[in-house]
Amino acid sequence: ILTPGEEGSNGAVSRAQEMAAQHPEWCFLYQYANDANPRAHFEGTGPEIWRDCPEITHFVAGLGTSGTLMGVGTFLKQQNPDVKIIAVEPPLGERVEGLRNIEDGYIPPVFENWHGRDVLDRKRVVRPRESIEWTRRLVQECGIFAGISSGASLAGAVKVASEINEGTIVFIVCDGGWKYLSTGAYTADLDEAEANAEKIIYF
């Protein structure tokens, strides 16, 4: 089911809500509001990070459904309130696949229900071109076939690293590259890849 590209993920969410209302017999998982989303990261991802990297000083992740940030961020703050929780988002009006700017008219219920503004210490803005550049570096230098929102998270983490004297930064590789093959993100000229990637929103 396709929704108008210019509506971005907001349009897709709205369409899904309409369909769920029309078909109450359907199961609507609604990851933007489903408490199981942040709960999985609060009970799983967060404890795993803390177990393996208790020296963490900064956690950086993309702001999409906000489930990862809310679950991991809440858990880490409970372990050490000094850990900085940083959201990566695209500039208002620009697209980075899988991410959102919470000023664009839709705030995920997960973000509100988990007191997102209290959990986050700050946000870092990452442009589509930066996202693609760092996605390519993940593939070429690390052998990780990551998606563009993962490249955005890495770009945000690099920005954080440039601003501190020392620390331990953890970021999340949250998607695979197979969803982005048609955009040319891995092979095309960078200008062309950026233009193609901005036309499509993936989930």
Question: What is the meaning of each model-derived region?
Answer:
Residues 1-20:
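Gly/Ser-rich phosphate-binding catalytic loop and adjacent alpha/beta segment
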Residues 13, 78-148, 163, 184-203:
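Active-site/ligand-binding loops adjacent to catalytic centers
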Residues 23-66, 72, 117, 129-145:
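Active-site/ligand-binding-proximal alpha/beta "capping" segment
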Residues 27-29, 60, 86, 124, ...:
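Hydrophobic/aromatic beta-strand patches that form the interior of the parallel beta-sheet core
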Residues 33-36, 64-67, 89-94, 103, ...:
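Glycine-rich beta-alpha junction loops
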Residues 51, 74, 78, 158-162:
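Short, well-ordered alpha-helices that flank and scaffold nucleotide-derived cofactor binding pockets
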Residues 63-73, 149-157, 180:
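Short glycine/serine/threonine-rich phosphate/pyrophosphate-binding segments
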Residues 145-148, 168-173:
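Conserved active-site loop/cleft motifs that coordinate metal ions or position small ligands
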